[in-house]
Amino acid sequence: MFTVGLTGGIGSGKSAVSACLAARGALLIDADQVARDVVAPGTPGLAAVLAEFGTELANADGGLDREALGRIVFADPAARGRLEAIVHPLIREETARRMGEVSPSGIAVHDIPLLVEVHAEGTYDVVLVVEAPRELRLHRLEGRGLPRDQALARMANQATDSQRRAAADIVVDNGGSLDDLDARIEEVWQDLLARRDAKATAKATAKAETVASGTDTAASGTDTAAPAG
């Protein structure tokens, strides 16, 4: 399996890039979706969160009132730590399970917004960073109903463009049209296929050399063995 860590600042257009890659055959694992799934109604994760923070955080349909929980944990680092202690192991386990569904020759794309912030660069074969001009990102976020001041605050709490570039193997400029993006992702996809094949070849070569080395060692031991007297 070949793994790609996909990241970028809020409003950069990671979802559009993910869709383009998925259309070409990548298996997409969305970190935000996994985080929601592990505390879905009826899950052990939701039960653990409600036991820790109170059953009043359950909404009318039995799900988690994420806004109410957010108000608690964002104002209290200790509470945030308790929440992370519950959900992070579940997220890692579920992510690993989904990764395990990828075929040995497949390409898995893990969309993880805070990849650089949690220093996960070394976890993937390739880190792909999506960029877009700041004002365009703000325009996109305002179009989603996020006020400009809140959008700026969220940007300020994320890694900088230069920090993300430093971690990147591939950078995608998503400041143009969807057609521009699709053309760029086709280039990226061919690059990923080539990197995947190179990894597979290197692995096969290393395995063959290990087998050959073991055979040579065994033969050498046989040649130098003292004859029975």
UniProtKB/Swiss-Prot annotation:
An annotated Gene Ontology molecular function: ATP binding
Keyword line: ATP-binding, Coenzyme A biosynthesis, Cytoplasm, Kinase, Nucleotide-binding, Transferase
A Pfam entry, by short name: CoaE
Subcellular location: Cytoplasm
Pathway: Cofactor biosynthesis; coenzyme A biosynthesis; CoA from (R)-pantothenate: step 5/5
Known catalytic reactions: 3'-dephospho-CoA + ATP = ADP + CoA + H(+)
Top-level class of the enzyme under EC nomenclature: transferase
DPCK domain ranges (all copies): 3-203
GO BP term (any one): coenzyme A biosynthetic process
Chain coiled-coil ranges: none
Gene3D superfamilies registered for this protein in UniProt: P-loop containing nucleotide triphosphate hydrolases (3.40.50.300)
GO cellular component entries: cytoplasm
The EC number(s) this enzyme carries: 2.7.1.24
Binding of ATP, residues: 11-16
Listed InterPro entries: Depp_CoAkinase, P-loop_NTPase
Chain intervals for the UniProt region annotation (Disordered): 203-229
Family recorded in the similarity comment: Belongs to the CoaE family.
Protein's job: Catalyzes the phosphorylation of the 3'-hydroxyl group of dephosphocoenzyme A to form coenzyme A.
Protein name stated in the entry: Dephospho-CoA kinase
Lineage of the organism: Bacteria, Bacillati, Actinomycetota, Actinomycetes, Frankiales
Gene this protein is translated from: coaE
